[in-house]
Design a protein with these regions (language model features):
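Conserved G1/Walker A P-loop phosphate-binding module
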Residues: 1-46
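Conserved nucleotide-binding/hydrolysis micro-motifs of P-loop NTPases
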Residues: 22, 76-77, 100-102, 141-145, ...
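Switch I (G2) and immediately adjacent beta-strands of P-loop GTPase domains
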Residues: 44-82
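Conserved beta-strand segments of the P-loop GTPase G domain that flank and frequently precede/overlap
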Residues: 70-72, 94-98, 136-140, 169
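Conserved Switch II/interswitch segment of TRAFAC-class P-loop GTPases
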Residues: 89-111, 119, 129-130, 142-147
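Canonical P-loop GTPase G-domain recognition
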Residues: 143-199
Length: 217
């Protein structure tokens, strides 16, 4: 939407990994943290003993010297309020589609929810103008035996009026294509910001860097 600004003037973009529970968001972020050398600082995780995210994971990462706060949302349906909180002010989204065929309905539920909460940002009314917030898809778990075909995912994106969405086929447990997808989303995020500035679109001044506050009881 609009990056925040640190006291030293550095712009900080916010990138969010969205998608159903078990889709691989935390696994992918942990891969970026542990294996790709892009992280600056620790990986913060608020999760339950079984590894399900309760609120978010958060990591500060640098891509070509640009700083990103990267969050994952808690995918379980009951954590809607937490997702809404994390989504605020997002500059770019990576949707983790669980390719396991059995998870089809969960993917659809999650995409619909995102469009309800953020549809005005990730959809464009005019095909010639890119949406305010770029979104890419990671079709994750491509190593599993019974996976949804990429064409079926494309059909869903077309029906959702996002026909040009870029899809990466990922395996988060082995890191396959995770960095490529991440760097692509990060670049889209920065590119979109400068496009907005160049075209004179209303870009509110960058606000101070913030973190989501924990939901109340
Ligand atoms: N086979 C396979 N398993 C994966 C892959 N990515 C993640 N997993 C597994 O899927 C399970 C769920 O992964 P998480 O990363 O915790 O999923 P999540 O999207 O963060 O889930 P929530 O925190 O509930 O939203 C874990 O057991 C992972 O090891 C993958 O690409 N292939
Ligand atoms: Mg998680």
């Amino acid at each position: 939407m609009c990056p925040s600004r640190r006291a030293d003037g550095t712009l900080v973009f916010k990138l969010v990994f969205w998608g159903p529970s078990m889709g691989g968001k935390t696994t992918a972020l942990a891969w970026v943290y542990e294996k790709e050398g892009l992280a600056s600082g620790q990986l913060q995780s608020i999760s339950d003993p079984t590894g399900r995210t309760l609120f978010f994971d958060r990591l500060v990462a640098k891509v070509s010297n640009v700083v990103f706060q990267v969050y994952t949302v808690a995918g379980q349906r009951r954590h809607k309020f937490q997702r809404q909180t994390v989504l605020k002010g997002t500059d770019a989204l990576v949707f983790f589609w669980d390719s396991d065929q059995a998870q089809w309905n969960e993917n659809i539920y999650s995409l619909k929810e995102l469009l309800q909460m953020y549809g005005n940002k990730v959809l464009s009314s005019d095909i010639k103008i890119p949406p305010e917030v770029p979104l890419i898809v990671c079709a994750n778990k491509r190593d599993l035996p019974n996976i949804t075909g990429i064409d079926k995912i494309k059909d869903v994106l077309k029906a959702a009026k996002m026909p040009n969405t870029v899809i990466f086929e990922t395996v988060a447990i082995t890191g396959t294509n995770v960095k490529r997808a991440f760097v692509y989303a990060a670049r889209e995020c920065v590119l979109r910001h400068y496009q907005k500035l160049k075209s004179g679109e209303q870009v509110p001044p960058a606000s101070p860097e913030t973190e989501p506050t924990a939901p109340g009881p």
